[in-house]
A protein has these predicted regions:
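Conserved N-terminal structural module of periplasmic/extracytoplasmic solute-binding proteins
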Residues: 19-91, 107, 279, 292-293, ...
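Extracytoplasmic/periplasmic substrate-binding proteins
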Residues: 30, 227-316
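Extracytoplasmic/periplasmic substrate-recognition and gating elements
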Residues: 49-50, 55-57, 77, 143-144, ...
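Hinge/lid segment of periplasmic solute-binding proteins
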Residues: 86-135, 142, 284-286
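Short, solvent-exposed loop/beta-turn-alpha elements that line the ligand-binding surface or hinge
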Residues: 100-114, 176, 181, 198-227, ...
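Extracytoplasmic/periplasmic solute-binding protein
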Residues: 125, 132, 158-214, 261
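Glycine-centered hinge/linker elements that transmit conformational signals in sensory
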Residues: 161-165, 208-245
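C-terminal capping/gating helix-and-loop segments adjacent to ligand/active sites or protein-protein/ligand interfaces
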Residues: 299-300, 306, 339-346, 360-417
Length: 417
């Protein structure tokens, strides 16, 4: 009898092990880049078909929505995703108890853009190399006899804006610039994060964080901030006011794609949108030139990182690590990142070049050098959206540059460390 019971127990244990080994694992990806959602959906479907015991789903929250708030809501509902995004130190500090060590992942040795914890542990998978400046329609500039290569100083850009503004009817323009700063329209990040990065990083060496560090200490470079404010006010002045104050991502991009604006304050992530809208004109980037010191530098970095939830089950974590390795190191992953999603890859082994014109402009700028880092992701969670964004929007409403400078200065004093 004892022998029979022993055999039965061992048999049940083996059945349990086999069942556990063959049980399907489901992992969910929660991300914020709405422009790549269709491509990501196709990729996770492909991966799920290629790995029968793993199902990957993807959910996208975009359009300037509160991504951090959405993750908090998921955590409160016991629905914390297995793979999600952080955008820098602010996100890491907030979610560090839910971020796994990815030291054993194959992709780590294939990139210089991994996100590392303060202890030097790789924890973040770089989504891509992204960048921005002031995008331009080369055909419109040529029609106005403006050479974009000469637009390297504030005075040169200002003269070009004035000339184009006087030719709007002739050129079929609604505005010189397509820019948005609406909090309700979800474009708060365009100005309070991306354009404002020119204050933090412009005209400095790539790893020179002195201006940003000074701001985080509660001290602003008053001359630099005043010059930036003049430039920002100029962008606002020459923008379509409806898009500026009430527009959303789609309306901002559509104005540029349709030839209704000569410039746009967006990054290379709009390449797929431009293709979908049928924009075939040549385009490129100039820098955010707010000083008279010549610059061609663009603002380039990894925009965000996938992290794996360390509180997920061991099986889910292992499946998530394998999924990210597949994305980074296989031809299928390279095809998704570059050919389908139009991203500039963050991984050295990926040799496919992006076809999108703005992404190609970034590749050229990277080869040229003299580009600038991103610092807005190091601000505390919610600071860019809920503190800075209303200040940037208010300047578009009342044009009070002194009040803008005072409000920005006070905002950084409130988070001084």
């Amino acid at each position: 009898m004892k022998k029979l019971l022993s055999i039965l127990v061992v048999t049940l244990m083996l059945v349990g092990v086999v069942s556990a080994a063959s049980a399907e694992v489901t992992i969910d990806v929660f991300q914020l880049k709405v422009e790549i959602d269709p491509m990501l959906q196709d990729f996770v479907k492909l991966y799920s078909e290629m790995t029968p015991d793993v199902t990957v789903t993807a959910e996208t929250l975009g359009g300037g929505a509160d991504y951090g708030g959405a993750i908090k809501a998921k955590l409160a509902a016991d629905q914390m995703p297995v793979i999600y995004m952080i955008e820098g130190a602010g996100g890491y500090d907030l979610w560090k108890d839910y971020i796994a060590d990815m030291s054993g992942s194959a992709w780590v040795a294939d990139t210089d853009l991994a996100y590392y914890s303060p202890e030097g542990v790789p924890v973040g998978f770089p989504i891509a190399m992204e960048g921005f400046g002031l995008g331009y329609n080369a055909d419109i500039l040529a029609a106005a006899d403006i050479d974009p290569a000469t637009l390297t100083t504030l005075s040169a850009v200002k003269a070009a804006f004035e000339k184009l503004d006087g030719m709007k009817a002739e050129l079929g323009l609604d505005s010189v610039v397509s820019c948005g700063t609406s909090t309700s329209g979800g474009l708060w990040w365009v100005t309070s994060q991306h354009v404002f990065d020119a204050y933090y990083a412009g005209y400095l060496d790539y790893n020179d964080s002195s201006v940003y560090d000074m701001a985080r200490a509660g001290q602003m470079d008053t001359e630099r901030l005043a010059a930036f404010t003049d430039y920002l006010a100029m962008l606002y002045q020459y923008s379509d006011q409806e898009i500026l104050l009430n527009g959303n991502y789609d309306s901002q991009v559509a104005a540029f794609a349709g030839g209704k604006a000569a410039f746009i304050t967006q990054g290379n992530w709009i390449d797929p949108n431009l293709a979908q809208l049928g924009a075939t004109f040549p385009m490129g980037y100039i820098s955010h030139c707010y000083l008279e010191e010549p610059t061609q530098g663009l603002f380039m970095a990894a925009p965000s990182w996938f992290v794996v939830n360390s509180q997920a089950t061991p099986e889910q974590q292992a499946a998530a690590f394998a999924f990210l390795d597949f994305m980074a190191t296989t031809p299928e992953g390279a095809n998704y990142m570059v050919a389908e999603a139009g991203m500039v890859p963050a991984f050295k082994s990926v040799t496919i070049l992006p076809s999108g014109p703005l992404s190609r402009a970034l590749v050229e700028a990277s080869a040229r050098g003299g580009n600038y880092n991103w610092y807005f992701g190091q601000n505390p969670d919610g600071f860019n959206q809920y503190t800075l964004a209303p200040i940037f929007e208010l300047l578009a409403v009342d044009s009070d540059k002194d009040a803008f400078i005072a409000d920005v200065t006070a905002a950084f004093a409130s988070i001084a460390q």
